[in-house]
């Protein structure tokens, strides 16, 4: 299901060495709770250890001491095969290759997979399944990369998360980490990485008591409301604008940021978004 060859395309040696260090120090017993959507490389996934009893079916995988719920990869598509009920493809990110399957349930799924072709850079959000040496990945969101700075940004996010999580293992209490490795009580309270490939500052929302609340978190909380999680098509941008009574441009900045880091993804069009982490 997985192969871990080392192709010539962008192979960051420094990052590879840091991953090897992480693999040596990470064991299932160091798990600190599941992260939401973790930016990872294929090499990190290949070295991930399964938590719980060895060989236990359904046990989550652990990377740098953190259980993975959903993962995000960026890489080149190859071997795309279309069937009536699913589309399979391979992602090559320069550190290895990982096979994915994307189930096709409706027209929106078909349109999403049709936009992806062999030789194209894509961003994929999915989950890991299987046992220790037989990992497989199921994709539930895939989109083409239109700005190639996103490839570099993804690797920066992987490095940052690796450093944050491995550093926290030394003499610190157990924590739950957000997708970018910042400690938080709910996994989402801090998002301090670059807001996009253009490195715009994260928008903030001034509330009535004079304090400033991270607008990204406020918008994300709307997507995570039970009714919106259950909605087939997610939430329209206009609904977010009405909720916060802020300029549409400001809301779009927050939504673009959340989509860039994998917390939400577009559904039927570029105006509808849904949480990538459903509780």
From Swiss-Prot:
**InterPro entries reported for this sequence:** NA-bd_OB-fold, RFA2-like, Rfa2/RPA32, RPA_C, WH-like_DNA-bd_sf, WH_DNA-bd_sf
Q: Which domain of life is it from?
A: Eukaryota
Family affiliation: Belongs to the replication factor A protein 2 family.
Q: What is this protein called?
A: Replication protein A 32 kDa subunit A
- Underlying gene: RPA2A
Q: A cellular component term (GO) from this record?
A: DNA replication factor A complex
| Its biological purpose | Component of the replication protein A complex (RPA) required for DNA recombination, repair and replication. The activity of RPA is mediated by single-stranded DNA binding and protein interactions.
| PANTHER family given in the database record | REPLICATION PROTEIN A-RELATED, REPLICATION PROTEIN A2
What are the recorded GO MF terms, alphabetically? Answer: single-stranded DNA binding; telomeric DNA binding
**Induction comment from the UniProt entry of this chain:** Repressed by sucrose starvation. Induced by gamma irradiation.
Q: Which residues bind DNA?
A: 71-145
Quote the subunit structure annotation.
Answer: Heterotrimer of RPA1, RPA2 and RPA3 (canonical replication protein A complex). Interacts with RPA1A, RPA1B and RPA3.
Q: In which tissues is it expressed?
A: Expressed in root tips, roots, shoot apical meristem (SAM), young leaves, flag leaves and ears, and at lower levels in mature leaves.
Q: Which UniProt keywords apply?
A: DNA damage, DNA recombination, DNA repair, DNA replication, DNA-binding, Nucleus
């Amino acid at each position: 299901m997985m192969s871990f060859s080392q192709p010539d395309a962008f192979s960051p040696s420094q990052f590879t060495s840091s991953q090897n260090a992480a693999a040596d120090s990470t064991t299932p017993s160091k798990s600190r709770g599941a992260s939401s959507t973790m930016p990872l490389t294929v090499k990190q996934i290949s070295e991930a250890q399964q938590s719980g009893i060895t060989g236990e079916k359904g046990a989550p995988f652990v990377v740098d001491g953190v259980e993975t719920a959903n993962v995000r990869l960026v890489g080149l598509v190859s071997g795309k095969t279309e069937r009536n009920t699913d589309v399979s493809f391979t992602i090559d990110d320069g550190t290895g290759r990982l096979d994915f399957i994307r189930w096709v349930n409706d027209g929106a799924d078909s349109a999403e997979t049709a936009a992806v072709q062999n030789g194209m850079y894509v961003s994929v959000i999915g989950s890991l399944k299987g046992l220790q040496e037989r990992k497989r990945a199921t994709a539930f969101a895939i989109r083409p990369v239109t700005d190639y700075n996103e490839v570099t940004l993804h690797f920066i996010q992987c490095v940052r998360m690796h450093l944050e999580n491995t550093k926290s293992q030394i003499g610190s209490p157990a924590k739950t980490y957000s997708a970018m490795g910042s400690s938080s009580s709910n996994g989402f309270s801090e998002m301090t990485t670059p807001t996009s490939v253009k490195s715009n500052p994260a928008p903030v929302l001034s509330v009535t008591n004079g304090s400033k609340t991270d607008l990204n978190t406020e918008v994300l909380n709307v997507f995570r409301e039970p009714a919106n999680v259950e909605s087939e098509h997610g939430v329209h941008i206009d609904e977010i604008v009405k909720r916060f009574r802020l300029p549409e441009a400001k809301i779009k900045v927050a939504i673009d940021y959340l989509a860039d880091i994998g917390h939400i993804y577009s559904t039927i069009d570029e105006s509808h978004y849904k949480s990538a982490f459903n509780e």
